Amino acid sequence: MRVLVSNDDGVDAPGIQILAEALRRAGHEVMVVAPDRDRSGASNSLTLDVPIRTRRIDAQTCAVAGTPTDCVHLALTGMLDYDPDIVVSGINNSANLGDDVIYSGTVSAAMEGRFLGLPAVAVSLVTQNHEAHHFETAARAAVEIVARLKADPLPADTILNVNVPDLAWADVLGFEVTRLGNRHRSEPCVPQNDPRGRTVYWIGPAGPEQDAGAGTDFHAVRTGHISITPIHVDLTRYQALDTVAGWVGGLTAALDAPA
């Protein structure tokens, strides 16, 4: 298969290099199109106000001065001279569990691939303090998942969000299909003073686990399993349509009121 590989940790990150090499050893044709620096937390942002510069590192690697979504969007809308068969994003050097997917550039790169018509997988290694020990485990999981998708494709609107415990392959207990868990609200932002005495802020840490019981991605990884969560682009909360329709009915009088 022709595999487009991207990430949000940057083109030089060890995770993406190990992933690309594992896919090549498995017989796939791999093209890496990734940010030229760390763009973690970029979510689905596109660069629209300035042109996007690219730099070919070699025949199979392109660095992009943009977001993960920019990378996949450019690759699938004309930058490459061929059409990839699948998008694989990662390997992220930290978890993308629960609410993390809202902010994750790793997941968003996969989401852009799915939005533009390709099967897509986001792969993250659940590390402690970004100290990764077993990227090879996540890479092998990715290779196995890509092979399975080739043999038995999933429905067209499905993105696979994969989180791998930082264990040796022999110590992984299996694959587990999960739903997204939830975290408590984020920790407070962190104010500091710059050298001129002005206040600056750092975004605070992610909140602790809240909904993390059996069946969630948090629980699967914590118990030594590879979590596979099917997600999709459509954010509509269908269960709330009738409730909100009744609620909107209460706004009708506002249309008849004088301005």
From Swiss-Prot:
The keyword Metal-binding applies. Disulfide bonds: none annotated. InterPro entries: SurE (IPR030048), SurE-like_Pase/nucleotidase (IPR002828), SurE-like_sf (IPR036523). Its cofactor is a divalent metal cation. Binds 1 divalent metal cation per subunit. A divalent metal cation binds at D8, D9, S40, N92. It is an enzyme of class 3 (hydrolase). Its EC number is 3.1.3.5. It catalyses: a ribonucleoside 5'-phosphate + H2O = a ribonucleoside + phosphate. SUPFAM superfamilies: SurE-like. HAMAP family: SurE. Belongs to the SurE nucleotidase family. This is 5'-nucleotidase SurE.
